[in-house]
Amino acid sequence: MESINYQILKRSEKKLLGLFFDYFQHVIKMHETLNKLLCEADVTKREKLIQAIYEMEDFSNKSEFKLINESIWAISKNSPLTNHLRLTITIIMCSRDLERICDYANNLTKFVKHYQHLDVSIFSKLVNLHKSVLNNLKQTFASLQDKEKPLTIQFENVTKILTEFEQQYRVVLTEYYDKVKDEKLSDRIFLIDLILSVKHIERINDYCYNIIKAFLFVKNPEVFN
């Protein structure tokens, strides 16, 4: 009986992880589309990319609800053991992180739409920062699927990426802050919006860190003792 229950739990885990990784791939695709938008000079193409991202945001909300519902159902139905319960709760927590990462893509898209009358070159520093977090998103996804390399190493890598990004991010922020002091009011409003967009990008890296940390805790809880 115990063996049968274990098999049921493992099947449930596999299903939840499958849904989670499908959702994660959608998040990456959404941010790849956003990066294209930040680089796109053609207004008509920009409009199509904006619409695509809005639709992806809607799909993201539905994916999160589905994943949470499946997770709650798995808990109520299967009476999971400690390790299985820990994984299921982690999937719920990380699905919230993925949803927030999509929210930031949506917010950045609204920013681009509001200022799409401006030359696309004005977003150049934003593009570079966003490419950095997009790469981190992809690395985080790959790390969670890599069964050979210990997550402790991936955790160290993400921590290093965050430190390097922090330096790059602060340089850009300082430059924008300095400009705010000197510009006229209309330009100042744009620069403040630009600074907020930089902050959105920074938060994406934080959520990548949270996701790796959460899955590391599932496998090696003693790391955080």
From Swiss-Prot:
Source organism phylogeny: Bacteria, Bacillati, Mycoplasmatota, Mycoplasmoidales, Mycoplasmoidaceae
GO biological process: intracellular phosphate ion homeostasis; negative regulation of phosphate metabolic process
NCBIfam families to which the protein is assigned, alphabetical: phoU_full
Signal peptide positions (record): none
Record-given protein name: Uncharacterized protein MG409 homolog
Domain of life: Bacteria
